[in-house]
């Protein structure tokens, strides 16, 4: 079953800033405890001032506190007397030089912390919880809020069993990281017990579509075709309507049965040199028959320059005819020409 994650911590570092900005190599726990005690004391002291958030910076050995409030006059006081007194008390407690900045919240109806605190204040004054919730929802939507959800949990109306009730108006995309969702929590201490109030406010997307388009790189301008140049398909019939298997010359296409047969060379033994054959798809003349290469032991002896080469060509006119070779079995006898007999 899905549970609700803290909307501020879920978006921390993405579109929400840290509320304590400092770094310490040693004594980190001591400084963190000092921040928590300082914020709790300020909220208790400025309870009627409508404090939304408190941010702490530590530049060097100094302390800078930023307070966002809907009633800055209560904190500053007449002629700045209250803020000076507050500054002296904080400096005495922290033993640091303290600077206080006051920021006014112009629309408290759109601040989740102030909305939850206003509902808690009404519940402590015995106002009906449904009426307080409906009033907060209507005022937030009237000031331009896109969505709001208010949840009240505890012994509502003094019931014996605690329960929860909530109102939701508008849209509330909790899974969208770019959504600007504010979250606040407050407690109402009544005679029947403690009632917890939670408020979610959706103010829109921080990175909208217009800003996202500006971040994208601009597309390259498309080149326009020159008017004096015809279209590619109209250039002398060389366009896309040509038949790639037609009369292109050679034997590239058409009927492959008209192609002259290519005489392949006989297989070459492993001892002979390798013969590279051209690709079969290129037109070439008929290959010459290659005589088989004999092994070195069976190759006929080549004549040297000292030996006389026997000519197999017919002799010239008037030259004596060669005598027929003798029989291998009877070297003393001569072969008789065909047609000659003993009785000739």
From Swiss-Prot:
Region (Disordered): 217-344
One example GO MF annotation: rRNA binding
SUPFAM superfamilies (UniProt xref): Prokaryotic type KH domain (KH-domain type II), Ribosomal protein S3 C-terminal domain
Compositional bias per record (Basic and acidic residues), positions renumbered to this chain: 219-259, 335-344
Gene Ontology cellular-component annotations: cytosolic small ribosomal subunit
CDD domains named in the record: KH-II_30S_S3
Gene Ontology biological process terms from the UniProt entry: translation
Keyword annotations from UniProtKB, A to Z: Ribonucleoprotein, Ribosomal protein, RNA-binding, rRNA-binding
UniProt cross-references to InterPro entries, sorted A to Z: KH_dom, KH_dom-like_a/b, KH_dom_type_2, KH_sf_prok-type, Ribosomal_S3_C_sf, Ribosomal_uS3_bac-typ, Ribosomal_uS3_C, Ribosomal_uS3_CS
Residue ranges of every copy of the KH type-2 domain listed in the record: 38-106
Main function: Binds the lower part of the 30S subunit head. Binds mRNA in the 70S ribosome, positioning it for translation.
Protein family according to the UniProt entry: Belongs to the universal ribosomal protein uS3 family.
Assembly information from the UniProt record: Part of the 30S ribosomal subunit. Forms a tight complex with proteins S10 and S14.
Protein name per the record: Small ribosomal subunit protein uS3
Source organism per UniProt: Solibacter usitatus (strain Ellin6076)
Taxonomic placement: Bacteria, Pseudomonadati, Acidobacteriota, Terriglobia, Bryobacterales
């Amino acid at each position: 079953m899905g549970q609700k994650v803290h909307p501020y911590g879920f978006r921390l570092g993405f579109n929400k800033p840290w509320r304590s900005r400092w770094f310490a190599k040693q004594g980190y726990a001591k400084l963190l405890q000092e921040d928590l005690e300082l914020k709790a004391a300020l909220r208790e002291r400025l309870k009627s001032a409508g404090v939304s958030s408190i941010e702490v910076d530590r530049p060097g050995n100094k302390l800078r506190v930023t307070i966002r409030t809907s009633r800055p006059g209560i904190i500053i006081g007449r002629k700045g007397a209250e803020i000076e007194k507050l500054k002296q008390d904080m400096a005495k407690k922290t033993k640091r030089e303290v600077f206080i900045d006051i920021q006014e919240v112009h629309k408290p109806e759109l601040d989740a912390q102030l909305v939850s605190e206003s509902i808690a204040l009404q519940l402590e004054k015995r106002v009906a919880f449904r009426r307080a919730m409906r009033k907060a929802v209507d005022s937030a939507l009237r000031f331009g809020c896109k969505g709001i959800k208010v949840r009240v949990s505890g012994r509502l109306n003094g019931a014996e069993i605690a329960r929860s009730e909530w109102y939701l108006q508008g849209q509330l995309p909790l899974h969208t990281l770019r959504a600007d969702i504010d979250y606040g929590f407050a407690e109402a201490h009544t005679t029947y017990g403690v009632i917890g109030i939670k408020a979610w406010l959706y103010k829109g997307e921080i990175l909208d579509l217009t800003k996202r388009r500006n971040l994208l790189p601009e597309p390259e301008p498309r080149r326009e075709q020159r008017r004096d140049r015809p279209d590619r398909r109209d250039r002398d019939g060389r366009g896309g309507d040509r038949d790639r298997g037609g009369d292109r010359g050679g034997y590239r296409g058409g009927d492959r049965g008209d192609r002259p047969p290519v005489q392949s060379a006989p297989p070459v033994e492993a001892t002979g040199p390798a013969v590279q054959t051209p690709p079969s798809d290129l037109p070439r003349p008929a290959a010459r028959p290659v005589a088989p290469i004999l092994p070195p032991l069976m190759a006929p002896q080549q004549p040297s320059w000292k030996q006389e080469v026997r000519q197999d060509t017919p002799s010239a006119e008037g030259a004596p005819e060669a005598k027929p070779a003798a029989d291998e079995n009877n070297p003393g006898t001569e072969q008789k020409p065909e047609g000659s007999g003993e009785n000739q």
